Amino acid sequence: MGSRGLPPLLLVLLNCYTSSSTQVIAIPAAATPAVTKEDLNSTKATPTTLQPSLSPRTPGTPRAPERSGPRPTPVTDVAALCVCDLLPAQCDVNCCCDPDCSPADFSIFSACSVPVVTGDRQFCSQKAAFYSMNLTADPPHRDFKLIDQINPSVFCIHISNYKPALSFANPEVPDENNFDRLMQTSGGFTLSAESAVPSTAASDGPQPTKYEYGAPLQTAGASSGSFLKLPSPLTSSLCADQNPAAFLVSQAFECSRRVDIEQCEGMEALSMAHYSSPAILRVPNSMTQVSIKIQSVMYRSLNHTLTQLEGHGVLRPSLVSTGQDRLCSNVVLQVKYSLLYTATGQIHEAGLSLVLGTLSSAVSLLQQKFEIHFIQHGTKPVPLSGNPGYRVGLPLAAGFQPQKGSGIIQTTNRQGQFTILRSTSQQDCLASEGLRTPVLFGYNVQSGCQLRLTGTIPCGLLAQKVQDLLRGQAFPDYVAAFGNSRAQDVQDWVPVHFVTYSSNMKGSCQLPVALAIEVKWTKYGSLLNPQARIVNVTAQLVSVPEPLPGPERTVVISTAVTFVDVSAPAEAGFRAPPTINARLPFSFFFPFV
């Protein structure tokens, strides 16, 4: 009997058995016939193979991995890259990858300036173009090879076929034609004085436990908003009330405000309570509040006289009528905050100083001043003699250096850092011992006294006594070059040159009689706002032979301070005239040189 096909019922049972079975049958790859394009398009019947069908897969059976297709074509063609092609539509000398060069140009090349051109070295496999010159051939010609390079690194890029990712996209510049379309795609924009970030977003991260430099000062209460406001001018001279005060940023602003005299009682910016009512948070996002204490209130009248108000409360603007004119009193003119902070970044105390005044109906623009200063708690502010240059009439900042490389040590008494002998009505040097006067910048001073001598005082002891009288207890070694020079910045201090002058008489006792101090200073900075800077300090101690012996002798002791301006005359600065910096091409004289 010839072979017959299986009965239809048996085939159905076999299919049901294989679809419900959980056994996985591995089929060798060699037994799987290769499927070509012709097989897929063919309409001929193929012989039936007695094996389980893989198309009906149960949910628990893993899918066989699919074979990946061919690699995409790289978007970067290294054969078309040329980094030495600088001249457009011209052949660059010794640039073997220049597409503008012909075989005749290659024949006169001496070498290839760029022998290897590669793409991104982070790829696992990349093309590399090698260029070389065959100078032994006649005529010389260029050799080109394109090879594959393998990156041995484990972390490498397999393939990159997304061309837009290889360069930055040019943003579309808004104009009158595409502005509406860009507004629709971007979703528009909003301007709001308050932060649009939800309050829940701030609670996700760790809460700050201190204020950092430049952080806005947070306040409690809805009347003043979230931050302490310090009005300031923005694009114009008008006051903008949404400027937050920043931690450790001392600022001073002056701006104008449009005022309607009939509405002055209802304007918060003119009320004293608007600036004293906010409570500053000791640290950000805390429950501890620091109230603002009113330290002083000055009242300025219409004729600009100032009067300090005592025992006052919170004054509010009040509109009064005086004949045909209407006045608004208790209007805030100046606001000054003084904040004490600790080294841990906390607000310790807040003070407020105000200047109130009267506003007339003839004034439509009100000038207001706002200041804020930060002072560290537990430290006393050091008075300065200028910022940065010296101011006339302020004492010189001086001190001494205990050892080389250390900072300058100053006394806490600013008036006693650099002093000279003070003249008294008695003109007695011994009676005026210990009385000193500070050296003030810009003031030429001369002082003196009389010393009555007797024959019982030895000359050596007397000379030391007079020298101590002229120099004082602590004569400084350094003087600050600027009025705000810091003690740790030794380069900003000028040494005091102490010179002693005495007669040439041998065998005689030299008695100091005069101390001449010369301070040379110059104008530093811009001509519009020059700053006084000390450049040299010289102290000359003049000694003379002891007077002839006698029952009673009188010696005049004097001290002089002179300030000398050594500023160079101002010269106008001009820009240097332009010069021609032309260079010939590298092969200009080729082949002669």
From Swiss-Prot:
InterPro entries with a match to the protein in the record: Tectonic, Tectonic_dom
One GO term (biological process): telencephalon development
Disrupted gene: phenotype observed: Null animals show disruption of nodal flow, laterality defects, and neural tube dorsalization. Basal bodies dock to the cellular plasma membrane, but fail to extend axonemes. However, cilia are present in the notochord, early gut epithelium, and mesenchymal cells surrounding the neural tube and in the limb bud. Null embryos develop an extra preaxial digit on 1 or both hindlimbs. Although sonic hedgehog (Shh) expression is normal, downstream signaling is disturbed, suggesting that Tctn1 is required for cilium-dependent Shh signal transduction.
Compartmental location: Cytoplasm, Cytoskeleton, Cilium basal body; Secreted
Omega-N-methylarginine PTM positions: R486
Region (Disordered): 37-72
Keyword Ligase in annotation: no
Protein name: Tectonic-1
Organism this protein belongs to: Mus musculus
